[in-house]
């Protein structure tokens, strides 16, 4: 581990919760502040709102008093509501139609980890001059670097439309590498917020390291709210 990535953590904090900060909450913070530059009271659409990054976005977005719409399966709607979001059943409701009915001019920003057709529809849900932050391409049929390349090309194409909207990629590992000062400052802030219980990472499951296959299956099935954490047994 490079020493510039190491930070002190109070002993009393739950290691599983601290682990959630390193990717999920850093990503959410990057989306809201560094890339999205969200202001208090704005309206946003959060896809996969009951997932690890989604619940982090809900909690950090709540501190900004954002009005938050979040897509999730019905069984996870209580989680979305608990953290201040308005749930949308993406399996039985057209999220774009729902947003257009609720916010005719469009939301200020949309956060999309899915890509493909979903990213294009997220773009349509955003008002003129709004922004779409992409942070993954989970819905694309291709894998690896090809998946990433296609997603980036799609974002570039959307940015050519003359409606003032912008589509931006948030790739947290890349942000950490190129801006270590941001990483250290932001993670230190998040650790302090956790210690003060201003944020409460949602741990959907704690799985022994030897059962890593089961953890991946849980993620693929999408039936866990929050983060799946691998635990090293004594």
Language-model features, listed with the residues they occupy:
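Glycine-rich phosphate-binding loop and adjacent beta-alpha segment
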Residues: 117-196, 231-234
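C-terminal capping/lid region of NAD(P)-dependent oxidoreductase domains
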Residues: 191-206, 213-234
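Glycine-rich helix-loop-beta junction characteristic of Rossmann-like nucleotide cofactor-binding loops
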Residues: 34-38, 101-104, 124
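Adenosine-nucleotide cofactor-binding segment
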Residues: 62-121
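Local beta-strand N-terminus motif with an aromatic residue
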Residues: 41, 84, 105-108, 199, ...
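N-terminal Rossmann NAD(P)H-binding glycine-rich loop of SDR-like oxidoreductase domains
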Residues: 50, 54, 58
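NAD(P)H dinucleotide-binding glycine-rich loop of Rossmann-like/cofactor-binding domains
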Residues: 1-48
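N-terminal Rossmann-like NAD(P) cofactor-binding module of classical short-chain dehydrogenase/reductase
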Residues: 45, 108-111, 133
